[in-house]
Amino acid sequence: MKSIYITGYMGAGKTTIGKALSQELQMDVVDTDQKIEEKQKKAIRDIFAEEGEMTFREYESEMLRSLPVHNVIITTGGGIIERAENRKWMKENGTVVYLYCDPNVIAERLREDTTRPLFQKKDIDAFVKKFESRRAYYEEAHIHIDTTNKSVKQIMNELKEKINV
C-alpha cells in the first residue's frame, strides 16, 4: 500500500487521526515535525526562532523525501503544503488526506497551546488569514474530511470509507 499523507492546518486533528489510523490499519505512523525535532535536536518553535521559517521549510522538504513511500502513515506539519514540490511529492507517492476544521474551532482548541510557533492567540484574524492562504493547497488532496465538531470515531469511519479499507 502506498503511504498515506495526512495534511491540514494546525489543530485540525492530524496527529490524533494519524495515530488512530495507524492502529486501525496496523501501519507505522511517522510525524514529520517530530522527526525534524529529533534530527535537529531542538523544538520546532526554537527552529523558527533561531533559524527562521524558510530554514524550517527546507528541513521539512528534506524530511518528507527521506521517509518511506509504502506502508506508512505520515502526519505532516501544517505548512508542508506551501511548497509545490512537497504537494507534488505526496500526490505522486501516496494518498493525500486533507483534514479540514473550521478555523474558529481550531483557534479555540489551540488557545492555551504554547508549542505552536505560528499561533498567537492575540491575533485570531492573522491566524484565519494564514489558514485561508493555504486552503487551495490543502484542497489539492485526494481525500477531504471535515473534522469540525466530529468525534475521532466519526472521522475514522469517513476516512476508512474514502480510502477503501
UniProtKB/Swiss-Prot annotation:
GO terms for molecular function: ATP binding; magnesium ion binding; shikimate kinase activity. Keywords: Amino-acid biosynthesis, Aromatic amino acid biosynthesis, ATP-binding, Cytoplasm, Kinase, Magnesium, Metal-binding, Nucleotide-binding, Transferase. Transmembrane segments: none annotated. It is an enzyme of class 2 (transferase). Its EC number is 2.7.1.71. Binds 1 Mg(2+) ion per subunit. Monomer. Belongs to the shikimate kinase family. This is Shikimate kinase. It comes from Bacillus cereus (strain G9842).
